[in-house]
């Protein structure tokens, strides 16, 4: 087995290698003056089971091309099997047609990954679960929940908490976490616009008065949804509001928005390399995802069950 990393999140690749007590295969990924990407693998990979680690986060197109070109190089170098390890799968929010004459970009990206040479895909918390079906190759979609459950239990102990979905679409994800937290109570933030031209109203489904609320979402991009939901929960009497997300996209001024909000804490994993600004923020904390990914890679390499990782 060999591990190889592109440039999107090298610290995560190093941490996965440490978990597996391996070293990363030597390679070079560089960008020419005209912005073309060049890849070279500096070790023999013939007949090897290779895992390529690369999140397709910002800059999404550059990171996607790095992954595609790296897999093409591995295929031409006669690697026996290529697994694309994509902790954060970019373009996942473009999983369906939202209007006439619009693309389904997530499906296109899935096709590109397969065509470039991937034999299987390993990813974490796809924005929409059906994206697994976009691939015609085996695809393992890991759940970040266990990482969060351990942290929540450590920090809150026996305190009564309520798991909150920041929107109706995330209820299934929130319910799954609540079950892992000894069937914790569940609440939902329901955003509604009463009529055209009127501002959005936050309705809270569930009683959060005096409760410690744990919001769960797959990602935090602009931070607006979580900040607004936290304000609504506090207005309805929540004693504290923390948010747990798998992917800290944190676009634009998201860090400042989180810091200015009433959100007590944003906890995210490192599927995307956190910026220095995020790391220094007193409101943001990062959980390592490398043990989960490393164990999944070990199981795939040894032909063991990946789903048993979540049998608890």
Curated annotation (Swiss-Prot):
**What pathway or pathways are given for this protein in its record?**
Metabolic intermediate biosynthesis; 5-phospho-alpha-D-ribose 1-diphosphate biosynthesis; 5-phospho-alpha-D-ribose 1-diphosphate from D-ribose 5-phosphate (route I): step 1/1
Q: Please list the residues that bind D-ribose 5-phosphate.
A: 193, 217, 221-225
Q: Which residues form the active site?
A: 191
Q: Which GO terms describe its cellular component?
A: cytoplasm; ribose phosphate diphosphokinase complex
Q: EC number(s) in its UniProt entry?
A: 2.7.6.1
Q: Which reaction does it catalyse?
A: D-ribose 5-phosphate + ATP = 5-phospho-alpha-D-ribose 1-diphosphate + AMP + H(+)
Write one Gene Ontology MF term.
magnesium ion binding
Instruction: Indicate whether Kinase appears among the record's keywords.
Output: yes
State the UniProt keywords alphabetically.
Answer: ATP-binding, Cytoplasm, Kinase, Magnesium, Metal-binding, Nucleotide biosynthesis, Nucleotide-binding, Transferase
Q: Does Metal-binding count among this protein's keywords?
A: yes
GO BP annotation list: 5-phosphoribose 1-diphosphate biosynthetic process; purine nucleotide biosynthetic process; ribonucleoside monophosphate biosynthetic process
Q: Which residues bind ATP?
A: 34-36, 93-94
Cofactor(s) for this protein?
Mg(2+)
What the entry lists under PROSITE patterns is as follows: PRPP_SYNTHASE
At the top level of its lineage, which domain of life is listed?
Answer: Bacteria
Cofactor note text? Binds 2 Mg(2+) ions per subunit.
Location within or outside the cell: Cytoplasm
Record-listed Mg(2+) 2 binding positions: 167
UniProt binding sites for Mg(2+) 1: 127
User: Function of this protein?
Assistant: Involved in the biosynthesis of the central metabolite phospho-alpha-D-ribosyl-1-pyrophosphate (PRPP) via the transfer of pyrophosphoryl group from ATP to 1-hydroxyl of ribose-5-phosphate (Rib-5-P).
- Assembly and oligomerization: Homohexamer.
Q: Which family does it belong to?
A: Belongs to the ribose-phosphate pyrophosphokinase family. Class I subfamily.
Q: What is this protein called?
A: Ribose-phosphate pyrophosphokinase
What is the protein's species of origin?
Hyphomonas neptunium (strain ATCC 15444)
Q: Tell me what gene encodes this.
A: prs
């Amino acid at each position: 087995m060999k591990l190889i990393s592109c440039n999107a999140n090298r610290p995560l690749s190093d941490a996965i290698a440490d978990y597996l007590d391996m070293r990363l295969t030597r390679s070079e990924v560089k960008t020419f003056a005209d912005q073309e990407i060049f890849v070279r693998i500096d070790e023999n990979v013939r007949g090897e089971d290779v895992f390529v680690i690369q999140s397709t986060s910002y800059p999404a197109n550059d990171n996607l091309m790095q992954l595609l070109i790296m897999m093409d190089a591995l295929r031409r170098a006669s690697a026996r099997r290529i697994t694309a390890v994509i902790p954060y799968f970019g373009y996942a929010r473009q999983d369906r047609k939202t209007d006439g004459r619009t693309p389904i970009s997530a499906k296109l990206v899935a096709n590109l990954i397969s065509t470039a040479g991937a034999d299987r895909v390993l990813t974490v918390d796809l924005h929409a679960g059906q994206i697994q079906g976009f691939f015609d190759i085996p695809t393992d979609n890991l759940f970040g929940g266990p990482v969060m459950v351990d942290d929540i239990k450590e920090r809150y102990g026996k305190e009564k908490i309520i798991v909150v979905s920041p929107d109706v679409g995330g209820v299934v994800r929130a319910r799954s976490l609540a079950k892992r937290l000894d069937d914790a109570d569940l609440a939902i933030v329901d955003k509604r616009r009463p009529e055209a031209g009127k501002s959005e109203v936050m309705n809270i489904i569930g009683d959060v008065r005096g409760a410690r609320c744990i919001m769960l979402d797959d990602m935090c991009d602009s931070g607006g949804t979580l900040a607004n939901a936290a304000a609504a929960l506090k207005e309805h009497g929540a004693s504290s509001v923390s948010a747990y997300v798998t992917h800290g996209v944190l676009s634009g001024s998201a860090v400042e928005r989180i810091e200015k909000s009433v959100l007590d804490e944003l906890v995210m994993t490192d599927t995307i390399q956190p910026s220095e600004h995020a790391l220094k923020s007193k409101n943001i904390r990062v959980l390592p995802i490398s043990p989960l990914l490393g164990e999944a890679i070990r199981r795939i390499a040894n032909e063991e069950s990946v789903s048993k990782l979540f049998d608890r």
